[in-house]
A protein has these predicted regions:
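A detector for short, charged/polar N-terminal pre-domain segments
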Residues: 1-6
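Short basic helix-loop element that most often maps to the first helix and adjoining turn
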Residues: 9-28, 53, 79-81, 86-87
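Ser/Thr-centric signal marking residues that sit
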Residues: 21, 34, 50
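Recognition helix of helix-turn-helix/homeodomain-like DNA-binding domains
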Residues: 30-45
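DNA major-groove recognition helix of helix-turn-helix/homeodomain DNA-binding modules
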Residues: 30, 49-64
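Conserved hydrophobic/aromatic packing and binding residues within compact polymer-binding modules
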Residues: 11, 25-26, 36-39, 65
């Protein structure tokens, strides 16, 4: 599972444990509901300020939104950031 999809699953889990709808979380976190939907579906990666708003509103540890995410440099692509080809 890629980083965006894993984060999305974690966000859904935390939101449901808090008994919040996307709309309710949107208001509490000051993050547009469409962005929350895209994050949950793994269509985008959360910026650090968005991450802080989400874990603060959900009253969870930041690590709860990052469970299962392992980053190995060069092993995946995220959004518009792409691996660079080796020189030579």
């Amino acid at each position: 599972m890629d980083v965006a999809a894993q984060f999305g699953d974690n966000l859904i889990r935390c939101r449901k444990l808090a008994n919040l709808s996307q709309d309710e979380l949107s208001v509490m976190a000051s993050v547009h509901r469409t962005e929350i939907s895209q994050l949950e579906r793994g269509l985008r990666i959360a910026r650090i300020d968005t991450l802080a708003k989400l874990y603060g509103s959900l009253e969870v540890d930041p690590g709860d939104l990052l469970v299962g995410i392992v980053w190995t440099p060069g092993d995946m692509r995220i959004g518009r950031f792409k691996e660079r080809a080796p020189d030579g």
